[in-house]
A protein has these predicted regions:
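N-terminal basic, Ser/Thr-rich segments that initiate or prime the first beta/alpha elements at protein or domain
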Residues: 1-477
Length: 477
């Protein structure tokens, strides 16, 4: 490709958007049409409905054709320019050095048409929470354009030698186990609660009464619903990350996965701001870890829950893969770090007493209105206190900070847990807080801010000694 190029999206972008809008419009018209009719629809009614639906589809088609024909993408003076000359003219210019990721995606329709969606993300704080540019091209053209952009925004020379490439892949069995370990504790407890509540009904089931038969069938359906939900979660994770592969090539990591929606990420290593190791409760019991990376571009889409990097595996395998793919982070699994200290219990107790002082009068008024007596006033606070004590204790055991020479590690969680590894140079800024009780015990909590999508930008720091926080401030400077 030459510099100062200018082109449009592939024309299939029109049909892709028309299909989405038409599907929504048809669904709305159909539901309203059916609910409003008291009798079976006549041929005239059906023709009117079809006419309105076709008119809407044609209107959307014409509008999308106008947008497509008057939208141009070009590269001018080391910048990517997107021009939209429709009713409202808009020109968006992005400096190529500010591009953090160049990613490829394919849904089923795009696979059938042989096209590919190319997504660009910037590494500026103002646009870190959204994908800036979506470009649809033929697959080969998209791959060429991707490599062209990577060449323009590279920070180091890309090594193409096969001896320098480091590859990792996951088998179908490993991806299936990843889906299993992704199940959270809440889902398991909810399922056990449902089964526990309906099992007595099943045991007492008689063979005579219709009402009992109805309750029996309903109970079975409820169990099937919840079990099916968990099975679907495992299946969804399996299908989403099937055919997973990751490759380190030069100064970039290339990540791809999925069969229903094929995703290809290109991640410049110098744009990775943190590495996060996650564990659900099941994963903690099985001593498994999954890896996410914190940067701009990954995990922005609503359907993507994580900035996925490596699936759940044993500690030894994860350590080996991270050493091969991201040796710059020098992640040490054995570092436990400094805990919060017993003074944190005084802070939590003070906060709890304050909330109880607000809650008990409200419960007393509610009990008087509902005529429940003192049961509500006593039982609700006791249950809340027990729940909070369990959460606080698990947090006390889990939350730690380790300050190394070049990076810090934050460990937090309750039943699930995560470890965040951050280089000091990647921290945008810190904020520290200290209440009266915390000041008396010489502890502080805070937040650190990274350049990332909105949900990964802010990370909490647990209560730590003031000396530890001062050391952290010194290292960030």
């Amino acid at each position: 490709m030459e510099n100062n190029i200018r082109f449009r999206n592939h024309i299939s972008v029109i049909f892709e958007k028309v299909i989405k809008v038409a599907g929504i419009a048809i669904f709305i018209f159909a539901t309203n049409f059916i609910t409003d009719l008291e009798e079976a629809p006549t041929v005239k009614d059906l023709l009117i409905f079809l006419g309105v639906a076709v008119a809407c589809i044609l209107l959307v088609f014409v509008w999308q054709c106008l947008i497509w024909s008057r939208t141009y993408i070009s590269i001018q003076d080391n910048a990517l320019v997107i021009e939209k000359n429709t009713l409202n003219r808009k020109k968006n210019t992005i400096g190529i050095p500010n591009i953090s990721n160049v990613n490829l995606e394919q849904n089923l329709l795009e696979m059938a048409l042989g096209t590919c969606k190319l997504k660009l993300d910037t590494n500026t704080l103002t646009t870190a929470d959204q994908t800036d540019v979506n470009i649809v091209l033929k697959k080969q053209e998209a791959e060429r354009f991707r490599m062209y952009l990577l060449g323009l925004c590279k920070t180091e020379e890309i090594e193409e030698a096969k001896s320098e490439e480091k590859n990792c892949a996951a088998t179908s069995k490993e991806i299936l186990m990843h889906g299993l370990f992704s199940i959270n504790l809440g889902s398991i407890l909810l399922l056990l609660g449902v089964i526990g509540s309906v099992m007595p009904l099943i045991k007492e089931m008689g063979a005579a009464e219709e009402a009992s038969m109805f309750e029996f069938v309903l109970s079975i359906l409820v169990i099937i619903w919840f079990v099916g939900g968990m099975v679907w979660k495992i299946a969804r994770e399996f299908l989403r990350y099937l055919e997973f592969s990751i490759e380190r090539r030069g100064d970039k990591v290339f990540l791809s996965y999925g069969i229903i929606k094929r995703v290809n990420y290109s991640i410049p290593v110098d744009k990775i701001n943190a590495v996060r190791l996650n564990q659900t409760m099941l994963a903690r019991m099985g001593k498994r870890y999954m890896v996410e990376v914190v940067n701009v571009g990954m995990g922005n889409d609503e359907e993507e829950q994580h900035s996925f990097f490596l699936p759940y595996s044993k500690k030894e395998k994860i350590a080996e893969q991270l050493e091969a793919l991201l040796p710059e982070f020098q992640i040490e699994f054995g570092e436990e770090g400094e805990g919060q200290g017993k003074g944190v219990f005084a802070v939590w107790a003070a906060n709890g007493l304050m909330w109880l002082a607000i809650l008990i009068p409200i419960l007393a008024v509610a009990a008087e209105i509902l005529d429940t007596g003192v049961v509500m006033v006593i039982a609700v606070p006791l249950v809340l206190i027990l729940y909070i004590v369990i959460l606080r204790y698990t947090s006390y055991v889990t939350d730690k900070i380790f300050l190394g020479d070049k990076f810090m590690q934050i460990s937090q969680g309750h039943f699930a847990r995560y470890h965040l590894f951050v280089k000091y140079e990647k921290i945008q800024y810190l904020t520290l807080k200290q209440c009266i009780v915390a000041k008396k015990y010489g502890i502080q909590k805070g937040q650190l801010y990274l350049l990332a999508s909105a949900k990964n930008k802010v990370h909490n720091l647990p209560y730590m000694r003031q000396e530890t926080m001062e050391t952290l401030i010194h290292k960030v400077r």
